[in-house]
Design a protein with these regions (language model features):
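Non-core capping and flanking segments associated with repeat-based/extracellular domains
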Residues: 1-263
């Protein structure tokens, strides 16, 4: 029995090509786009990419997660000191999820290059999720933030964490909040080491959650203007709280706030 003939996808009308692309998972689309300049240009022309979501994670290993129309693809970049493993790829399927591991000497650099290509193919300027543990790649935090500043117009939901209390990430936190635009949600779960910590807090968020908010005193609270505000471990006194509530009720301050929780 002779092998099947290659399917001439590029000879199809564009609408038919687009239907073929809709049946592909995001990795298949990216792999197709890498074949030639022509396939790359065709890959960038699809009209349904607005339904795709792109998420970035920097925890134990950097990750790019792509939510397609049917499948969710996660690409992990795993640091390796084994020369034989450098560049190797492992893929596993689990239901709707496709897990892709890429072994690299410099996972952050590879993660950046792969992300730029993903953004180009799917014609994205903003990303849906950024989740970052600031104590994982401390020496590269500034480089990562500068990269995001140059390549991402905005982030819809951002979560920042600190796993090692002994590592001071105050400056990195402030630098990220000064340079990355956050549209909808900010979750901040880190320890504060400096009394003068005073980062920019985005305005008009749908939700602001700060789990160690000792640095947010009364005057700073008056500046917060988000729809839902949750502040844990907060030092505001009962007297200040009562004054704030009175101002809030008569709409003298924080007019966008609909829900406020202090602990």
């Amino acid at each position: 029995m002779s092998p099947p003939k290659p399917f001439p996808i590029l000879r199809l009308p564009f609408l038919a090509i687009e239907e073929v692309f809709k049946a592909m998972d995001p990795i298949e689309i990216i792999n197709f786009s890498m074949i030639s300049k022509r396939t790359k240009e065709i890959g960038k022309r699809m009209s349904f990419y607005s339904n795709y979501a792109i998420e970035l994670y920097v925890h134990e290993m950097p990750e790019i997660r792509l939510h397609g129309t049917k499948d969710v693809v996660s690409s992990f970049y795993v640091m390796t000191s084994d020369k034989e493993m450098d560049g190797k790829i492992e893929e596993k399927e689990w239901g709707r999820y496709i897990i892709r591991k890429v072994f690299k000497y410099d996972p952050i650099d590879e993660w950046k290059q792969w992300f730029k290509y993903v953004m180009e193919i799917f014609r994205k300027q903003a990303i849906d999720v950024l989740t970052m543990t600031l104590t994982t790649f401390v020496d590269q935090n500034v480089s990562i933030i500068d990269f995001l500043k140059s390549n991402v117009k905005s982030v819809d939901r951002c979560s920042l964490y600190q796993r090692d209390e002994q590592i001071n990430v105050d400056k990195h936190t402030a630098y990220l909040l000064d340079n990355v635009k956050i549209n909808s949600e900010l979750c901040y779960d880190a320890y504060i080491n400096n009394d003068d910590f005073n980062p920019k807090i985005p305005k008009s968020l749908q939700e602001l959650r700060i789990y160690n908010s000792k640095w947010i005193e009364y005057e700073r609270l008056l500046e917060i203007d988000c729809k839902s505000v949750i502040l844990k471990n907060n030092p505001i006194s009962n007297k200040e709280w009562n004054v704030f509530v009175k101002k809030w009720r008569v709409m003298e301050t924080n007019q966008n706030v609909e829900y406020l929780e202090l602990d």
